[in-house]
């Protein structure tokens, strides 16, 4: 599907010096909406290239969060490499970095220095703990953010121990908030003509994302919040199903379906607040009924009653469901290194089949091309390659 619309961020130049997931995911969204994003990496590459199973110099995480970018590999520790970095940031609309506080300053690439030659730059600096406080210089990964902010207490296992959510949730959330902040700063610049420093950190993003739970924790003294009953996951004879029958009419319908009409009049369950107070007993009774039949049966019958429900799906269930295909949740792309892979459609964005928006670059894949675009001669580029200031993919 292609709407033929002009990408809204076309013409914007982005210097993406970030690594990992948070910064790259922000830059990834800018690229998907048409910005010219240059992925700037040191000779060793973004560390996420090595995270998980590797496909040459690529890994699934790198591919997912760096689609649509071009790659430039430069060594800031060389005179030539640093000069290249300074030239590019002076001509960039947006700069994104995710080093610990002070690192970019040591190279003269911090906001205060950059804005002297590029006053309209939007500079997004992403860190773990922020630029203040006793933890400002501590290294952070997603699991640290999940642990420090209390997020893991929302995911206790049967052992009662808080566990990490099995993906880089805090990183992705930080990237989304960073993209939001950059987008509003772009509008501000269009209206007022001024640049902006955006200081983003993972703990702040996590707190914002969990805002409701944090308020509930304080007001309810740590007690678990039950929004209504019956809701949640119930066992079936071939898996489990999730349903919500909180409203009185839905509870009535569910009681009839599981052939337990007496529950409606049971003094433990005949009012909203009573169902919440006795949620464990109610859940156990409903589970005794749901475990006798299959997911397919319950889905069909609950749908008839317009009761919110969904079987607990695997990734394969989701990927190959007819709804997933019909609504373009996923694009299947033939990647040159990974083969046929599923790529999630950006919400609100037109699906794509292949091309630059689906391509995640190899380390230094576009180095020579980018340097040429920024005014460097062939002789200068050759010298950069010889001195190790620049690395071009495919050249030794």
Task: Give the location of each predicted region.
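N-terminal helix-loop segment corresponding to the beta1-alpha1 unit
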Residues: 1-191, 217-218, 362, 368-396
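A short glycine-threonine-serine/GTX helix/turn-capping micro-motif
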Residues: 163-173, 197, 225-231, 240-242, ...
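C-terminal active-site "lid" helix and adjoining low-complexity regulatory extension at the edge
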Residues: 341-379
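Glycine-rich beta-alpha junction loops
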Residues: 44, 128-130, 202-207, 238-240, ...
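A glycine-rich dinucleotide-binding beta-alpha-beta segment and adjacent secondary-structure elements
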Residues: 304-357
């Amino acid at each position: 599907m292609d709407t033929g619309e002009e990408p809204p961020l076309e013409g914007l130049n982005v210097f993406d010096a970030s690594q990992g997931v948070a910064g790259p995911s922000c830059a990834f969204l800018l690229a998907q909406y048409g910005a010219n994003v240059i992925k700037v990496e040191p000779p060793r590459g973004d560390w996420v290239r090595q995270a998980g199973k590797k496909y040459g110099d690529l890994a699934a995480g790198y591919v997912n969060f760096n689609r649509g970018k071009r790659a430039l590999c430069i060594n800031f520790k060389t005179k030539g490499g640093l000069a290249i970095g300074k030239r590019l940031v002076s001509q960039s609309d947006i700069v994104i970095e995710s080093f610990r506080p002070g690192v970019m300053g040591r190279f003269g690439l911090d906001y205060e220095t950059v804005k002297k030659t590029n006053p309209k730059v939007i500079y997004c600096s992403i860190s773990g703990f922020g630029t203040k406080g006793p933890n400002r210089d501590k290294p952070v990964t997603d699991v640290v953010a999940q642990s420090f902010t209390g997020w893991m207490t929302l995911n206790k296992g049967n052992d009662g121990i808080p566990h990490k959510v099995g993906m880089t949730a805090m990183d992705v959330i930080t990237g989304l908030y960073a993209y939001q902040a950059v987008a509003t700063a772009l509008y501000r610049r269009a209206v007022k003509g001024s640049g902006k420093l955006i200081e983003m950190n993972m703990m702040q993003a996590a707190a914002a994302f969990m805002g409701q739970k944090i308020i509930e924790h304080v007001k309810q003294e740590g007690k678990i919040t039950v929004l209504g009953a019956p809701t949640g996951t119930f066992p079936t004879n071939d898996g489990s199903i999730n349903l919500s029958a909180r409203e009185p009419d839905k509870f009535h319908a569910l009681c009839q379906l599981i052939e337990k009409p007496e529950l409606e009049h049971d003094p433990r369950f005949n009012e909203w607040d009573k169902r919440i107070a006795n949620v464990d007993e109610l859940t156990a009774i409903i589970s005794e009924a749901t475990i006798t039949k299959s997911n397919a049966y319950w889905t069909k019958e609950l749908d008839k009653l317009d009761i919110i429900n969904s079987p607990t799906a695997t990734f394969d269930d989701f990927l190959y469901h007819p709804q997933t295909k019909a609504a373009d949740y996923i694009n299947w792309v033939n990647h040159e290194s990974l083969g046929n892979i599923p790529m999630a459609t950006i919400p609100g964005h037109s699906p794509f089949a292949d091309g630059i928006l689906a391509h995640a670059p190899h380390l230094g894949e576009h180095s020579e091309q980018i340097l040429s675009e920024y005014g460097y001669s062939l002789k200068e580029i050759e010298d950069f390659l010889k001195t190790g200031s620049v690395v071009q993919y495919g050249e030794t």
